[in-house]
Amino acid sequence: MIVVGAGLAGLNCALTLQDRGLSVTVLEAGDAVGGRVRTDVIDGYRCDRGFQLLNPSYPAVRRYVDLPALDLRSFAAGVAVAGDAGTTVVGDPRRQPGLIGRSLLSGFARPLELTRLAAWAAPALGPVSRLLDGPDMTLKESLDEAGVDGRIRREILEPFLAGVLASDDGSTSAKFVRLLVRSFLLGTPAVPADGMAALPEQLAGRLREPVRLGETVTAIESGPKVRTTAGEEPARAVVVATDPTTAGAVVRVRAPRMKGLRTYWFAADDAPRTDNLLVVDGRRDGPVVNTAVMTTAAPSYAPAGRQLIQATTLYPTEATESEVRIQLTRMYGRSAGAWEVVVRHDIAEALPDQLPPLEARQPVDLGDGLYVAGDHRDTASIQGALVSGRRAANTVAAALAG
């Protein structure tokens, strides 16, 4: 078996095939495993390639990942909303009951608005099968239909979701957003102490045959047969588990539109906040969709005595670094002018677009011994990537046994 691509989908596919007693070779064009889940270590700072979080409530994560070994560092179950009158903290009342009164009195979540928001989100806590049944619509249409409006929508929900979805136009599938809301309600997002790259590295470490790095696939032919920069590889089956654009170029699969994010990683002597909350801008008067002091949750992300702050915008963007610093200064109430840029990541293809109607289980068998896996075949998430990899592997195994 040959798996092309050592992202989460490819690695979980290879592990599933291996568990079924099959010999697997994983080819990866890059210099490390992970695909879009990578971490750059620069002068002692751990900068994930784009701000990413791991939600331990994902069923596939609980099933396939050794979570204790990742030494997860959790963010708080809430969000800090920067506004003209300062910053207001709005938390999950089930896990941070002390914030209930503050949330209600803040003006962001009046009782009627809370009731409407709860009614809109209610399907997220029911069976997933029921959540996925029925017609779909855009996020904007679903919020309008549910009467979710006011400051809770404009200053919290929409700014928060813009960073999660890599989109602020409300066009994302409402079903997909509710799936994400479900994961947020059931778990607290975190990062591994060694960076997000620790997740794919853990999966790759279980493979009996090491991933072959630096091998670019140039063609996939009937047989099936894979041509790479190192030569020709015959196989009983080939699973293409690359990014969607690459997959669309080498096999017969339609590549979805991809959405981008830009993340600045800043180093500072002092933390502008001492809690481990994600911060959004309720005023929405700048390019930053979210920011966080990574080292308040994960001190290992920076050298001792130093702080690491991420700031994320949509991409592409014409916003300058100066505009980002000005907005961060307003959001934190402390000057960001002297912060040092460790690195800036422009992720042009951060997430596949998830337009309605949501297609959560797209075909993985392309015929002639060719298969495809990736979050673009399931849902645009770590959960979707892991599930897709296993689904493709099971399909391969069934075909070989049949």
Predicted segments, located by residue:
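N-terminal Rossmann-like FAD-binding beta1-loop-alpha1 element of flavoenzymes
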Residues: 1-26
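Glycine-rich FAD pyrophosphate-binding loop
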Residues: 18-42
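Glycine-rich active-site loop/strand segments that organize a redox cofactor
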Residues: 38-57, 118-132
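Short beta-strand to alpha-helix junction loop
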Residues: 52-59, 131-137, 146, 182-204
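Mobile amphipathic helical/loop "lid" adjacent to a hydrophobic cofactor/ligand pocket
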Residues: 61-62, 66, 70-170, 185-186
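Helical element adjacent to the flavin cofactor pocket in flavoenzyme catalytic cores
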Residues: 178-229, 233-234
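Mid-domain catalytic core of redox enzymes
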Residues: 218-322, 331
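Conserved flavin/dinucleotide-binding core of flavoenzymes
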Residues: 294, 299-402
